[in-house]
Amino acid sequence: MTFALGQRWISDTESDLGLGTVVAMDARTVTLMFAASEENRVYARNDAPVTRVTFNVGDVIDCQEGWSLKVEEVLEDEGLYTYFGTREDTQETAIVLREIFLSNHIRFNKPQDKLYAGQIDRMDNFVLRYRALQNQFEQHKSPMRGLCGMRAGLIPHQLYIAHEVGRRHAPRVLLADEVGLGKTIEAGMIIHQQVLSGRAERILIVVPETLQHQWLVEMMRRFNLHFSIFDEERCIEAFAEAENPFDTQQYVLCSLDFLRKSRKRFEQALEGEWDLLVVDEAHHLEWSQDKPSREYQVVEGLAERTAGVLLLTATPEQLGRESHFARLRLLDPDRFYDYDAFVEEEEQYAPVADAITSLFSGEKLPDEAKNQITELLSEQDVEPLFRIIESDSDEEAKASARQELIDNLMDRHGTGRVLFRNTRAAIKGFPKRNVHLMPMDIPQQYTTSMRVSGMIGGKMTPEARAVKNLYPEEIFQEFEGEDSSWWQFDSRVNWLLEKVKEKRSDKVLVIASRASTALQLEQALREREGIRATVFHEGMSILERDKAAAYFAQEEGGAQVLICSEIGSEGRNFQFANQLVMFDLPFNPDLLEQRIGRLDRIGQKRDIDIHVPYLKDTSQAILARWFDEGLNAFAETCPTGRAVYDKYSDALIEMLASGDVSNLDEVIEESAKMNKELKSQLEQGRDRLLEMHSNGGEKAQQIVEKISSTDGDTNLVTFALSLFDTIGLNQDDKGENALVVTPSEHMMVPSYPGLPYEGATITFDRDTALSREDMHFISWEHPMIQGGIDLLMSEGVGTSAVSLLKNKALPVGTILLELVYAVDAQAPKRSGITRFLPKTPIRMMMDARGNDLSPQVEFEGFNRQLSPVNRHLGSKLVTSVQKDIHSLIEAGDALVEQKVEEVRKQAHQDMQQSLNAELERLQALKAVNPNIRDEEIESIEEQIKELTGYINQAQVQLDSLRLIVVSHN
């Protein structure tokens, strides 16, 4: 291949990029700029997947300025073409057009050229291509796009929040659901929608160090989003590729600590030009008016430079209104600038909440409530609605009038658009916790080793001593060596063996603080009783943990017991189990809540049993009593636990380190009192209005119904299997709704998108995918389907075919020509064009006279009457009627224009309807709710203008065609 600057080439693999221009070359590579889609590509010079663009005499070509030229002569000079000819619009002759000025939007790879050249595809490939176009079109138009393909149960409040926020331009919100309600999943769904719609291409997730793997796994397992963890080591490696290591990946995950410690890395992250920033555990960002913490400043710096920001926090505002304000200030500093003004404004929402409560109850509205509503909304808006509510209209009309009032009030509610918070109290469907505390005698061996350790302990801080005393088995091993079998005499192990045997039919999750303890417990279960158990700890790779989790999840032949270490269990959920054993206790209430949260989550079908075996007169006994009597943390979620712990931690550490429990009762009593006070403050301050808004009510149910109606789509299964067949993947039925798909030697391409080298087990069933983490959940949004469709399109599979129609009612040799056109607007993905004008297939069925029969001849039914022909015979048939085909394509091209106009018109209508409604709503709200940002309104106005241009320029192209010949035998 010889390249020269200014030459025009087209990509073989990505024909939708438009026409490319050579803009740079060196000895090994060539760079092409595709102006139509605002993309650049760098290829290896010797095997670049591109084709040189040359036109011949008689062709009509478009210039960038919008006029067309009919070519009469072509000259080549130093590798560049110049075209001479007549302008189509002014009829001027001897016009010169150099190839550098050719329109960027020109397309190639005509299916008719393939047909004439005898490159005839199989009939079933033509069918697959048409179905791919059809399905892709429907998926892009679906308002639920981005929500159907995730591996998660359909939980109304999560879907509502994700749907509400995911569609916004550059969303800036605070997700503050209580523990166990699935904030990570909500954030993942929002990210997924933003990625699919093209609104977010570069994403940075900042989390505490211990949660990095959890996020990595959740994003990959649930949403097929592959993030890269960045730490110092990774940045040094990446430096070889780019000056700023953050530029080497689109999806980056790093810890807050990493950015805090290194100013250099923080500054590089600031220059990363992110579209979306996600910060987990945002309640750890300390802020006060005089002195914000370094962590807070790091996040503030990133939030100022990033359009979209999601903050996740589990702490309710009543425990720290100031810190709550600080979080909102990160999202919108112009709006939340003064803490005192914020407090005052918050207090004005009480009447809104009262008004909404009376609307929700469905009772007659008292005058007081009416006056409050009229004050908040303008009179002309509410009067007609009041009339409907009080008239004898049918219940449905009343309900919808009520809902409209509620929606309007919600919109005007101060933080309704910025803050979402669901509480367990407001969401039903949580299991009951049955707590079993079991004090046990301490073995003599432990008493001795702990006494000796105390005597020779040397200088240790009280905190280190307190932690050490919690794990007597480790102290024993310090004296007796790592291999000492403490599990032969530990009374907790004896109890555990009996419990597991007693619960033969139940899955048991055991959590211990240390990985070494977990490994030795597995050995004890195996060697002493032959019980099938598997281990899960931080020393294992993600793949090994997946395998362990899958082994535990298996109904038949799986492990009965899974033993986790503290860190190993983070972020994993085992809702299918309901027996939890805490072999020891963690040091703080947050970790305790996390442990219970492995089973006690939304989606848990049964009540859970929490077993806490502990050794009498040890540190564990102190903690067990404090957690149970001081916080009631085993039986209920404990949002207040951290605040109580912070106050009494010094006293607790002192007791755990010294073993002196003389004032334990007093600490427990005071803790219980403080806990009760904080909880009642929480209950009184519950923002009912916010809860009503956050759980989405009716709307949330409708979203669930829409998505569940697409689950189990047989159309998807049929399509996926044909797709895998065509591309050449091996498929083995595994039973239980599962298939194993592996690459084969005769594949169309060296590697299949989204499929690991060793293959994958897939399922189309959501419930199976939820209980088996080792399976891929296949939906229309999965990379294996999306990538497969892109592959079909780019490889030109099924663009031309020939079929026979056995029908004695028609004369032998009658021909029909099936034409499939695609209307496509070339525009950057982030413009949001696919919502209104995705690639749209238009099918036409031309008879020999040039009439379109497609309205009478439905695709699937007609296709069943056809039979395939081999390539040799097909080629002969094409040659014999080539002239007719040519004139039928011309007739089709003329007829399709009108249909394209209809498609454009519909796209305009959809776009205007959707965006104008949103624009009017925001403009009306801006007058009463300062939470509407100017950028949001400007962005929609800009989007309407941009999209109008793109839709007007949408082009139609013949995508594929099939010649059909009538035969009688």
Swiss-Prot record:
The keyword Transport does not apply. Its EC number is 3.6.4.-. Keywords: Activator, ATP-binding, DNA-binding, Helicase, Hydrolase, Nucleotide-binding, Transcription, Transcription regulation. PROSITE patterns: HELICASE_ATP_BIND_1, HELICASE_CTER. GO terms for molecular function: ATP binding; DNA binding; helicase activity; hydrolase activity, acting on acid anhydrides. SMART domains: DEXDc (SM00487), HELICc (SM00490). A motif (DEAH box) lies at residues 280-283. It is an enzyme of class 3 (hydrolase). ATP binds at residues 177-184. InterPro entries: Helicase_ATP-bd, Helicase_C-like, Helicase_RapA, P-loop_NTPase, RapA_C, SNF2-like_sf, SNF2/RAD54-like_C, SNF2_N. The keyword Nucleotide-binding applies. GO terms for biological process: regulation of DNA-templated transcription. Interacts with the RNAP. Has a higher affinity for the core RNAP than for the holoenzyme. Its ATPase activity is stimulated by binding to RNAP. Transcription regulator that activates transcription by stimulating RNA polymerase (RNAP) recycling in case of stress conditions such as supercoiled DNA or high salt concentrations. Probably acts by releasing the RNAP, when it is trapped or immobilized on tightly supercoiled DNA. Does not activate transcription on linear DNA. Probably not involved in DNA repair. PANTHER family: DNA ANNEALING HELICASE AND ENDONUCLEASE ZRANB3 FAMILY MEMBER, SWI_SNF-RELATED MATRIX-ASSOCIATED ACTIN-DEPENDENT REGULATOR OF CHROMATIN SUBFAMILY A-LIKE PROTEIN 1. Belongs to the SNF2/RAD54 helicase family. RapA subfamily. This is RNA polymerase-associated protein RapA.
